[in-house]
Amino acid sequence: MSAPISTIAEIGKHEGQAVTVRGWLYNLRESGKLLFPQFRDGSGVIQGVVPKNAVPPEVFDAIKGLTQESSVIVEGKVRADKRAPGGFELDVSNVQVVQRVSESDPYPITPKEHGTDFLMEHRHLWLRSLRQAAILRVRAEIIRAARDFFDSNGFTLTDPPIITPAACEGTSTLFPVDYFDEEAFLTQSGQLYIEATAMALGKVYSFGPTFRAEKSKTRRHLTEFWMVEPEVAYGTLDDIMELAEGLLTFLVKRCLERRRADLQTIGRDVTKLEKIEAPFPRITYDEAVQKLQEGHAQGALENKFEYGGDLGSPDETYLSSQYDKPVMVNRYPASVKAFYMEPDPQRPELALCVDVLAPEGYGEIIGGSQRMASHEQLLKRIHDHNLPEEAFRWYLDLRKYGSVPHSGFGMGIERAVAWICGLEHVRETIPFPRMLHRLYP
């Protein structure tokens, strides 16, 4: 194989030239003396054309004998064809079979309908499908875009620990770890730690895995997921709502610019994403409750929402389906939110917090707040929540030595991917999802 190597994604740069493509057989169709193999290489799929009278017999026979997912190196001339996916085809002239999948043990995910349990059990192979590969490329783009957004806006990436000391927010949804005979837990959030780095660096963000031992089986829950969490010294609730608005519009725009073809492969209606631009609607918790109670009265919600409760998945789904942009629900009752949130000075029973609900019924993808700045108030809140003061001694120190107003939020990568890709379930948003009853593969 003497022709230069090209990825399928960049094959259009070589129109009229011979190239080498390294990948796998995705599909093979035969029509008389013509073979139409489809090759994939991770960057895309291209159709090859193999006329029997145009290649040596051994090349034709080798391609004809290929089985699904056999690994191959093919050489051919790139030809433009508007009818072809991607706009190009490959006139194959040579092939090297790296490994032929055995017919006695064929590739298990054949081109037919398979149940979800079967596909999840074979997740390591399901990733090779066009749809799953497209989702993972969109995921990578979202992560890259989030980093670019914060890096270009003066934020410093800081890395909080994944193993944390005992009982930071209660242990009911934490995964315990035996840490050299000390009790420790896998992190639920890097927030407390990046509050500390924000006091050192001003504007910071973290990106990493988080773990929640919640026995939830909803389409929105994973036990292991990834979050991007910014924190801003001297930042207010309004500041982070504006920041969240900027981040989400940036992510959507980037995916439309760079991953439109992948979104179309997934079947996403991109016209809905094209509507995502600032400003986003903002409603208070009180206004949200009114909308939910009206929805119940109209028969759209089964249960009547009672004031003072936190929003559940059906409530978020209903509210977010009322808008074609993300909606920012702010100022929840402090009693249903985390202990560290600053109270609203106008109504101290409310917290200066926000949940950003993605449209089309996708619900919460961002949660954030202004953090409590007073040492005395924070200490009281820790006691009120029956949390161990000693575990938070370092966190309380942040309020003793130059405390300032500060704010931040967390965005779940998987929920953002689900929304932008238009997916029904978050299990498709990460290569190997961890769920209540899913630890393999």
Question: PLM ranges: what are they?
Answer:
Residues 173-253, 275-441:
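A translation/RNA-centric and nucleic-acid-associated enzymatic feature enriched
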